[in-house]
């Protein structure tokens, strides 16, 4: 059966002949096959250092309408199925049980602190029927984020004119400025 692994456990069946007037005696047995599963995970890294990042939130969505065996839509396309948050190792795994023969996609819904959310990076995959000896399909994707940065421009202007040109013999060159943090700055790495 598509979407299930083959059960390789031997089953014993007993059929005996008693005599020609007796109906064949038999015992029934049940054989269960396991439905194939998807192992889905994300990895979060800094775009420059490639160090793992914690605190990134990723949502797994249905990539198409998901139908039951009767053909009825049970989950509409674009529905959020589960959101996970990356740990200190930069990894997160989904626990939702995904139906086979459907498409899915993952998108960042919140960037880690001090990082810019990458809304354009979307990981799409199709969970299709596997060979009957394969119990699980693995899907993993690495997302990267840029740090939030700032640029500071300082201009020296004449006090009286408000222009970047000195008056008379005055000079605007050679000024020394200091930039100080109000709070301690901790590097994310």
Question: Where do the protein language model's features map onto the residues?
Answer:
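Solvent-exposed loop/turn and edge beta-strand elements of beta-rich ligand-binding domains
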Residues: 1-189
